[in-house]
Curated annotation (Swiss-Prot):
Record carries keyword S-adenosyl-L-methionine: yes
Species whose genome carries this gene: Shewanella sp. (strain MR-4)
Family in the record: In the N-terminal section; belongs to the methyltransferase superfamily. tRNA (mnm(5)s(2)U34)-methyltransferase family. In the C-terminal section; belongs to the DAO family.
Protein's name according to its UniProt entry: tRNA 5-methylaminomethyl-2-thiouridine biosynthesis bifunctional protein MnmC
Source species taxonomy: Bacteria, Pseudomonadati, Pseudomonadota, Gammaproteobacteria, Alteromonadales
Swiss-Prot/TrEMBL cofactor(s): FAD
PANTHER family named among the record's database cross-references: SARCOSINE DEHYDROGENASE-RELATED, TRNA 5-METHYLAMINOMETHYL-2-THIOURIDINE BIOSYNTHESIS BIFUNCTIONAL PROTEIN MNMC
Main location: cytoplasm
Compartment list: Cytoplasm
Length: 699
């Protein structure tokens, strides 16, 4: 059963409000819109900024009603022959977040797609991706990675200034939409320049002279297009200005260096992956599978080493897992990251599920993913938890597609069983089978790139020799690999190179409960003191225990009773709770790796021995604290070259794992990231040490 969908009244903005924030495309005819898109693409092929290593990166200032974006994506889809294997990444910066419901309302009410019906398929794909009204970047992937759209919502200067520069794949061209052109100032244009190639061009329709001057002063060439030119009436109505000022280009270089120096404590890979050298991945769960898929979408080969006979036998082995974002009252980096990650994972699941239904002779079978986006209903279970939940609800004006408050009657209607208390409903959440998710990701990766999986291969030792990594397993030696990723869950700290990572194992026992009587009517995931899923194949999942440094992974009768007790405490006097039967002693035990700050670990493996050695050298006394802080702030943090960490997903790996894997894949291949510097700093595997060192504190 599926919970009833959220009501449209949850969305606050009507069409007149939307049309003011997202003005219609100035190019009213299909011909003029197509001409603008063709012009943009033709300028790419005439510049030295042709697609770099199979990836073309374009920027867009403003979303408007989205037609310029739709036209670009549609042209890219239909130009398979001319573009070859080149992929497209479009980074759109829009100050006013918008969701799929509002986008559809905008398109329907304006009837803007009626005369441009060729854009309807890609418009439907955008709507299906369900962009949300959240702050930050939302990465949308289409056509098996051939097209990627990054929607950067929120303050424009913040979005630009906090975005890492990609030296290998900078932005090659910008389109400035008229309704936001007046908001561009010198600081923003310089940040755009920092993120761009030195000969990137800024294109716009009827660009103001002041904006063109700003662009020229930061080293941008400009192309000012008139309406007549796009209507095909005056081919000479293109005003192009080429800027080749070496001083301005040097200032751009300094700006990039300053940004890199300011974030030196979050190191970048020292050498990028190449397609003819596979990346080694140790692990067999959701994180490693999604990393393999993200790499494959880039054409990057990889080799997986899994200690079990199939994927998803560790923490990813549960029958059902809840998927929904972690929110905080402050809506801080943690909360914003989990919203971005949850939405990304949800899109992954839907894309893989669609692919599993499209079996052909040319494409091997993709594992079907059991899942139901039936929503997640969160309620308090005691006074303290209720106060915390109330604080989360009341502290922010949460987008309704992320979560909204419900009263007791609405909670009962959503759950289809007696709840009788108010709560917080996550309408896009639900449950998914983690091990099927992992298998589907690897199945899809095998269609896109050269991937290999070694099962029943437990890696017991890793070593670095001459800047290459070798893996040892039962007398076998694998390698050399230029890049090695440790994504092996509970075994993450088993190697000498990773044993000091500040991360802890927690045992979790999930109980399997027969679906019967009123309990079987549950239509949404319940989250209170523990969680309870709707039935799947005749069983509910109830859990989970949370035991640090457990001595064994055997079934524990006490934890089985504790799982039941949590539901009894959360929903007292409800008849359906009496239907929870744990007498079969059916359960599954796994270990999840947890960090103190609840962020996953993603990025370069820290050289902890070198960090401690430098600490002894630079943290000699209190008088040198400021000097030490400056050293750690501006000096690249020590890393183990070629070794990377992807782990610490905790109890919300279904939400956080796929985006963390996507970001690591982008780092390994030198591509632009969908995360900003503050979030990357929080994900940095060295953060527990560097956080103190950057403040001049003792370790």
């Amino acid at each position: 059963m599926t919970a009833k969908p959220q009501k449209s009244c949850q969305f606050k903005r009507d069409y007149p409000q939307l049309i003011n924030l997202y003005p219609p495309c100035a190019l009213t005819t299909a011909q003029s819109l197509d001409n603008l898109t063709r012009l943009r693409l033709s300028r790419l092929t005439t510049q030295s900024t042709q697609p770099i290593q199979g990836l073309c990166v374009m920027g867009q200032w403003g979303l408007g009603d989205g037609l310029e974006l739709l036209s670009l994506l549609q042209h890219w889809q239909t130009q398979t022959q001319t573009q070859g294997n080149t992929r497209l990444l479009v980074k759109v910066f829009e100050p006013n977040p918008i969701n799929d419901y509002e986008l559809k309302l905008l398109w329907d009410q304006s009837q803007s797609l009626i005369s441009k019906s060729h854009l309807q398929p890609i418009a439907n794909a955008i709507l299906k991706a369900k962009p949300a009204r959240i702050i930050g970047c939302q990465r949308l992937i289409f056509d098996d990675g051939r097209i990627t759209v990054d929607l950067h919502f929120g303050d424009l200067h913040t979005a630009l200034s906090q975005l890492p520069h990609s030296a290998d794949h900078p932005i090659q061209q910008w389109l400035v939409l008229p309704h936001l052109a007046a908001q561009l100032n010198g600081k923003q244009v310089w940040q755009m320049a920092r993120l761009s190639t030195d000969d990137a061009q800024l294109i716009g329709v009827n660009l103001a002279e002041t904006l063109q001057q700003l662009a020229h002063k930061s080293g941008f060439s400009t192309l000012n297009v008139s309406q007549d030119a796009l209507n095909g009436d005056a081919s000479d109505a293109l005003q192009s200005h080429i800027i080749t000022d070496e001083i301005l280009l040097h200032e751009r270089k300094l700006l990039r260096q300053q940004a890199d120096t300011a974030q030196a404590f979050t190191p970048k890979p020292t050498a990028l992956a190449t397609k003819d050298h596979p990346i080694a991945i140790v692990g067999g769960g959701l994180a490693s599978a999604n990393l393999m898929l993200s790499l494959a979408e880039r054409g990057q080969s990889s080799t997986l080493f899994c200690k079990d006979n199939e994927l998803g036998q560790g923490a990813s082995g549960n029958r059902q897992g809840a998927i929904y974002p972690l929110l905080t009252p402050e809506n801080d980096e943690l909360s914003r990251f989990f919203q971005q990650a949850f939405l990304f994972s949800r899109r992954r699941i839907e894309a893989l599920s669609h692919a599993s239904m499209m079996e052909t002779e040319a494409a091997p079978t993709i594992t079907a993913i059991s899942h139901d986006f039936c929503g997640v209903l969160q309620t308090g279970h005691d006074e303290r938890s209720q106060q915390r939940l109330d604080k989360i609800i009341q502290s922010q004006d949460w987008p309704a597609e992320i979560a909204y408050a419900v009263d007791a009657n609405e909670a009962n209607e959503i759950a289809q069983i007696g709840i009788d208390k108010a709560g917080f409903f996550y309408p896009l959440g639900g449950w998914v089978c983690p091990f099927e998710y992992a298998k589907a990701a690897v199945d899809k990766a095998s269609q896109l790139a050269n991937v290999q999986c070694h099962f029943n291969t437990e890696i017991t030792e890793i070593e670095c020799d001459a800047k290459a990594w070798y893996l040892h397993s039962q007398g076998q030696r694998f390698g050399p690999f230029r890049q090695l990723v440790l994504a092996n869950g509970a075994q993450l700290t088993q190697f000498s190179a990773s044993e000091r990572l500040q991360i802890s194992p927690f045992r979790g026992q999930v109980s399997h409960v027969p679906a019967q009587f009123k309990l079987s009517q549950l239509a949404t995931v319940l989250c209170a003191n523990g969680y309870l899923t709707p039935s799947h194949q005749g069983l509910h999942c109830l859990g989970a225990s949370y035991v640090k440094a457990a001595e064994h992974l055997d079934f524990c009768p006490q934890e089985q009773w504790e799982n039941l007790g949590k539901m009894q405490e959360s929903y007292p006097n409800q008849a359906w709770v009496d239907d929870i039967d744990i007498s079969d002693n059916s359960a599954r035990v796994g270990v999840r790796m947890v960090t103190r700050d609840h962020f996953p670990m993603m990025g370069c493996a820290p050289d902890v021995a070198e960090i401690l050695a430098r600490y002894e050298q630079h943290q000699l006394n209190q008088q040198q604290a400021e000097q030490s802080k400056h050293y750690w702030q501006t000096t690249p943090a020590p890393i183990l070259d070629g070794l990377y960490i992807l782990g610490g997903l905790g109890s919300r790996g279904l939400s956080s794992g796929p985006l963390a894997a996507e970001c690591l894949a982008a780092q390994l291949t030198g591509e632009p990231l969908p995360l900003d510097w503050p979030t990357l700093n929080k994900l940095n595997p060295n953060r527990m040490w560097l956080r103190k060192l950057l403040k001049g504190k003792a370790l």
